[in-house]
Curated annotation (Swiss-Prot):
Protein EC: 2.4.1.227
Pathway(s) the chain acts in: Cell wall biogenesis; peptidoglycan biosynthesis
Membrane topology: Peripheral membrane protein
InterPro entries: GlcNAc_MurG, Glyco_trans_28_C, GlycoTrans_28_N
Source species, domain of life: Bacteria
Gene coding for it: murG
Keyword Transmembrane helix in annotation: no
Descriptive protein name: UDP-N-acetylglucosamine--N-acetylmuramyl-(pentapeptide) pyrophosphoryl-undecaprenol N-acetylglucosamine transferase
GO biological process, one term: lipid glycosylation
Record's subcellular location: Cell membrane
One cellular component term from this protein's GO annotations in UniProt: plasma membrane
Provenance organism: Caldanaerobacter subterraneus subsp. tengcongensis (strain DSM 15242 / JCM 11007 / NBRC 100824 / MB4) (Thermoanaerobacter tengcongensis)
CDD domains assigned: GT28_MurG (cd03785)
Catalytic activity: di-trans,octa-cis-undecaprenyl diphospho-N-acetyl-alpha-D-muramoyl-L-alanyl-D-glutamyl-meso-2,6-diaminopimeloyl-D-alanyl-D-alanine + UDP-N-acetyl-alpha-D-glucosamine = di-trans,octa-cis-undecaprenyl diphospho-[N-acetyl-alpha-D-glucosaminyl-(1->4)]-N-acetyl-alpha-D-muramoyl-L-alanyl-D-glutamyl-meso-2,6-diaminopimeloyl-D-alanyl-D-alanine + UDP + H(+)
Length: 364
């Protein structure tokens, strides 16, 4: 069978598609899989790296305010729709699966018009605009949270599946992760990561935190590729001493080692990040991004904070002193860390990819 995936922009839309595609290949070795994305999204790099073919179309998101860019967006939407139609005609997929991002719009609507079976997956507790608009037309809407079902009242069918995660994340032990990353087992490891695009406020706060003397834990800062040079410049400008207990890297393509090695994660609250840290069971301090549509990251974070697995600090309240005190408090309470770890794991759904594969088989 031929499977077409549409999704992109950030890792949060790409990695679920990759996880589902790998699940398909596990069950159907002869399956043909094609991804559709854009030239500017992270899919341009990540999809080929995962071993899948990617074709691109022209599309961009609508701005909140009317402007010349709005006209450009409308023009690109028509262009993208024509390009999507050609891809469907050439590839002849048996099913089209959308995992979010602007690219889903033209591809999924073209598939609906051609009466090709369709499924979309929503990662966030509060759904994105593209998926909300597509939901009345597609065959199945798969959601990650029970809380999301109420937003898809006009959908034909809504199923709670959880978020698909990559199987390799669950296979690494702490010792293996520490060795791979070059950290000692003798001290705790705190990891900060701002998502696939990075997070300037988290990065700058972590650099400030490195100035605090008598720090008893190791630090890994994953800056995001676009922020790496800026972070190194700040380190140099402010004469921050980096010893063997600190590493700063732009990005990691092997998050399985990072999650396994970490005692505490400091991260955004994107849906895929949350799915991964719950599956692995990493106690985390969540800093929801205030720059996302409908403030969905805080919505995600508060939903899980209420379960006792994570602590939340809003970006407007974030500073090095507050973050350091929170880290020190958690590290001084091993029983609390263990409790957070267990509560996180209890909320995870590690079979989401298989559930979605089973749903796909019901419409093909």
């Amino acid at each position: 069978m031929r499977y077409l995936f549409a999704g992109g922009g950030t890792g949060g839309h790409i990695y679920p598609a990759v996880a589902i595609a790998k699940e398909i290949l596990k069950n159907e070795q002869d399956a043909q899989i094609l991804f559709v994305g854009t030239e500017k999204g992270l899919e341009k790099e990540l999809v080929p790296r995962e071993g899948f073919e990617l074709v691109t179309i022209e599309v961009q998101g609508f701005k909140r305010k009317l402007s010349f860019d709005t006209l450009k967006t409308v023009y690109k939407a028509f262009t993208g729709f024509k390009q999507a139609n050609k891809i469907l005609k050439d590839f002849k997929p048996h099913v089209v699966i959308g995992t979010g991002g602007y690219v889903c719009g033209p591809v999924l609507m073209a598939a609906v018009i051609k009466r090709i079976p369709t499924l979309i997956h929503e990662q966030n507790a509060f759904p994105g605009l593209t998926n909300r608009l597509l939901s009345p037309f597609v065959d199945i809407v798969a959601v990650s949270f029970e809380d999301s079902v109420k937003y898809f009242k006009k959908a034909k069918k809504v199923v709670v599946t959880g978020n698909p995660i990559r199987e390799e994340l669950l296979r690494v032990k702490k010792e293996e992760g520490r060795e791979k990353l070059g950290f000692s087992m003798s001290k705790p490891l705190v990891v900060s990561v701002g998502g696939s695009r990075g997070a300037e406020k988290i990065n700058s706060t972590m650099v400030e935190l490195l100035k605090i003397k008598d720090r008893k834990f190791q630090v890994l800062i994953i800056t995001g590729s676009s922020n790496y040079d800026k972070v190194l410049e700040k380190v140099k400008k402010e004469n921050v001493v980096l010893d063997d207990s600190v590493k700063i890297v732009p990005y990691s393509h092997e998050m399985q080692y990072v999650y396994a090695a970490a005692d505490i994660m400091i991260c955004r609250a994107g849906a895929i990040t949350l799915s991964e840290i719950t599956a692995v069971g990493v106690p985390s301090i969540l800093i929801p991004s205030p720059y996302v549509a409908n403030n969905h990251q805080e919505y995600n974070a508060r939903l899980l904070e209420r379960q006792g697995a994570f602590h939340v600090i809003l970006e407007k309240d974030l500073d090095a002193k507050k973050l350091y005190e929170k880290i020190e408090y958690l590290l001084s309470e091993p029983s609390l860390l263990n409790e957070m770890r267990e509560k996180a794991k209890s909320m995870s759904r590690t079979d989401a990819s298989y559930k979605i594969y089973q749903l796909v088989k019901t419409i093909t």
